[in-house]
Structure formats: C-alpha cells, structure tokens
Amino acid sequence: KIGHPTLTMIADEILYDDIKSEKIQTLIDDMIVTMKKAGGVGLAAPQVNESIRMFVMKPKMFKKAEVIINPTIEYIESAGKKDSNEGCLSIPGKTFTVERYKTINLAYYNRSGEFVTERATGFRAIVAQHEYDHLNGILISDFFLPIIRHLSLEEQELIPKM
C-alpha cells in the first residue's frame, strides 16, 4: 500500500539464470493469484514487497495473464497520448487521470526466459505503462505532486487524503 518504502525504489533487474528458478516462478504464480483476487488487471513485484523488475498483467478478460520480466519501453510519440482514468491496488478506492502514450514498443523476457518484443496499443499499452512506472518507484499519485505543491494551503486542504 501507499507509503511502503519498496514502492518508491527503483527495482533491480532479475538475472537471466534466475528467471526459471523456483523462487521467481512461485512469485509469478502468487502475483497472478493476488492480482485476480484483488480484481486488478496488473500487479508489479514492488507492490508485493519484491524490489525486482517484473510485473504480471491481464488486460483482456479471456486471455491468460502475461508475465513481463526486465521490461523496457519505447514510447511512440507520433501515435500521441490520451488521458487514462486509472486505479491502483496500492492506493485502494482512488482513481487518477494520467496522460499515457497510446502506443509503445515493449521488450521483455517472459516466464520461460524467451525474449519478446512487440508493439502494444490501447488498454494493454496503458496497463504496461502503469506497471512499468511501479518498477521505477512511481505511483499514479506522484503525477499530481508538482501540481499540489503550487496550490495554496487552503486549496491543498480540499484535496482528499490518501
């Protein structure tokens, strides 16, 4: 949950030889179960107090959960951005409007250790960007801190507390 120090850290890469280890494979299974039980569409390892560069996501109802390890994202600026109304399992009951790229190139290892590169669009791209932010110690609420700092104390008092 918000306030936990692991959520603000830049996560460490997973060594390639560790991807198929029992520890990582068990963590993957546990994260998928946790994500589904919470009704989420994504969950990053830092959200379960593991500061490693991995997340799971299930942006489509009838597809299997995807495992994304050591991802890199290239933002496709020419495709433009859009406002995304997002919730986060680390900030229950709150939603934030965040500007996201419509299209990204995503490179990562899957749970079998295979290297994958693909172009992601739409909701899948948004979920990937949200979870990727977690790997860099960024929460959706962080996008609003610079705005809040410029408000008067009276205006800040009107903002709901997390």
Where are these regions (language model features)?
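Active-site rim/adjacent substrate-binding subdomains
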Residues: 1-129, 133-162
